[in-house]
């Protein structure tokens, strides 16, 4: 049992309040996922010539400056690093593939948890309220945000096993449910060149999406294909550079509710998380249909 929540702002005047609006939504899902929590927030887009990386290390005192200086020397590029908790946001004009390769060769202890132009991913073990505070998200500004509270069922309680999982540039996925064919699919995807850091079934779903997108599918097509290729019960919430997308499996036994006002669109495992938003009492509220892709902001 896990909790997933998402908030997309239609009213740009609310951007400065995104973190404050989202915090009670995430915390409300604590009883569904007290083991760990994570968020993907979309903010501060880089130049087109730059890439923003979300990096993580188990040591909160890790020296990120050596990553900064090492990349600049090795790749002859410009870098800027910002430490947030045991994570780091790295912005660089180096090629993404070159950065990932260099990190694997010289600093395998560092995990790349996301990349793109606007996405920033933060995740950690512990109660959602503590995780949110650790990464200073209370006053965060942005356009949209998705989050997850985890009660581990398929793998260990670790930071690496926490959601969201990156699925491509400015793309990430959170999941409520359980996939029964993730071990077989993981081996199939490994043969296609996909790499895995955990035994988490959600990481397999994220890798599946990445593979589909790399081989020509649109996000909507990838989500529709998942309905037949992935066995199990699931609700997926996928963050994109300009919005988010939602899909439930054909049986739709995992809870999900959506709501929309003139100011925002929200999704949550349970309505009580949405009820905390301003204007929720006047929102259009509905349960997403089985096997149907919903998207906002050009998300799919």
Which residue ranges define each predicted feature?
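Conserved short alpha-helical segments that host acidic/polar catalytic motifs at enzyme active sites
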Residues: 1-300
């Amino acid at each position: 049992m896990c909790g997933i929540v998402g908030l997309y702002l239609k009213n740009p005047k609310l951007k400065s309040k995104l973190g404050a609006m989202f915090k009670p939504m995430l915390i409300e899902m604590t009883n569904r996922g007290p083991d760990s929590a994570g968020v993907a927030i979309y903010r501060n887009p880089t130049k087109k010539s730059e890439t923003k990386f979300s990096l993580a290390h188990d040591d909160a005192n890790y020296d990120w400056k050596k990553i900064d200086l090492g990349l600049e020397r090795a790749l002859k590029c410009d870098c800027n690093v910002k430490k947030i908790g045991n994570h780091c946001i790295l912005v660089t004009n180096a090629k993404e593939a070159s950065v990932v390769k260099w990190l694997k060769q010289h600093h395998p202890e560092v995990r790349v948890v996301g990349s793109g132009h606007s996405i920033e991913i933060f995740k950690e073990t512990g109660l959602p309220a503590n995780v949110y505070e650790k990464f200073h998200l209370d006053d965060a500004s942005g356009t949209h945000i998705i989050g997850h509270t985890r009660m581990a069922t398929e793998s260990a309680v670790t930071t690496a096993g926490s959601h969201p999982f990156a699925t491509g540039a400015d793309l990430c996925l959170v999941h409520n449910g359980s996939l029964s064919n993730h071990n077989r699919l993981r081996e199939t995807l490994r043969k296609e060149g996909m790499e895995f850091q955990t035994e988490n079934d959600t990481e397999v779903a994220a890798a599946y999406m990445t593979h589909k997108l790399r081989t020509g599918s649109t996000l909507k097509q990838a989500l529709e294909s998942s309905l037949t290729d992935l066995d199990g019960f699931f609700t997926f919430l996928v963050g994109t550079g300009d919005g988010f997308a939602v899909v439930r499996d054909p049986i739709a036994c995992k809870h999900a509710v959506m709501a929309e006002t003139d100011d925002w669109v929200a999704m949550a495992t349970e309505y009580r998380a949405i009820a905390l938003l301003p204007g929720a009492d006047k929102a259009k509220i509905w349960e997403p249909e089985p096997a149907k892709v919903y998207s906002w902001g050009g998300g799919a």
